[in-house]
Amino acid sequence: MPPDQLLRRTFELCEDFAAARRMLETTPVARPVIYVLTGCAPSQRCVIERTETAFTTREDETSAANDWVPCRPGWEGRIGTHRFLTSSFADAAGYSRARRETLDRWNGACAAANFDWVQEPVLNPYTRLAVAMCPAAGILRTVGYDRNGGPLPEPVTAMCEIALTPAS
């Protein structure tokens, strides 16, 4: 099954975090994929790194940035086209690690409605959308980015916030 279709199916069929995690870990997929899964309880978060038939799940350092943790022989981190012909596999892994470590340092507090965490190396020439979510509080915030002549994108939309009352 294509990874995006598995994700859609998981949203449609799973009633809780545990069921979603099982489905994302065990359903065969057509190609490797990295999922970040978050529930409503503080302990409900993980990164699921999938190959077609196997998985590795991390419950600590639950951010992902286009590379496996730890790096695996035969797999290289993805990089932007501006670095495509000039970066080694080690460089690509380093860029992904830097993004992941930057995200890990963000405290994730949704009380502050800002996107100060969207900075290099998370912010890159291809950033077009930043999203902050808190399922427990029913909050979803987004900001659109685009390049305005500079080397990096800048916010070009107002922050959009959707706040729902959590289900009891």
Give the residues covered by each predicted segment.
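C-terminal, well-structured catalytic/ligand-binding subdomain of enzymes
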Residues: 1-168
